[in-house]
Every structure is written in C-alpha cells, then in structure tokens.
C-alpha cells in the first residue's frame, strides 16, 4: 500500500478512528471521517461509487461497521487495510501526523 501511496496510484484510504487517534499517526494521504459521523458525512468521500476504497481503524471493528455503511451508500469496492493501524505501526511503516483533512 505504501508503494502505491508514494506512486500516486493508491485508492481512497479512509480512516474511521477518532480525531485524537488520527492526529497521533495515520496512513499518509488518508481521508479522516470518524466512524460515528460517517452516515452523515459519506458524501464527503470523493470519486465514483465504483472506485475502490480501503477502510481502516485501530484493530478492525469500526472499519468493518463502516464498510456496511459504505456499501449501503453505494460503494461497490470496499476493502480493509490488512491488520489495520495496529499492524501498520508494528511494521514500522511511515505515518503522517496531525489533524484531519
């Protein structure tokens, strides 16, 4: 995934964790919409509903629930970041820090 981010070919990456979790470190280029606000903010996700979207949270539960919301909103290609943020950190992969975009 990091290679695709660096090459500019990554799909939309959606972080559904809290604001403080996102600010502490997130996948570079991720869009931040906290899970509990997703139903009201799903229209903020740019691109056609047919485009792929990769969702993650800290360990998985919020991301899986977000996937249900996204599919109900018409997103057809929802996948999950393997291992979510926990595995990303354990692997020592580069993180961006700071507020939501």
Where are these regions (language model features)?
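Rhodanese-like catalytic fold shared by cysteine-dependent sulfurtransferases
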Residues: 2-12, 19-54, 58-101
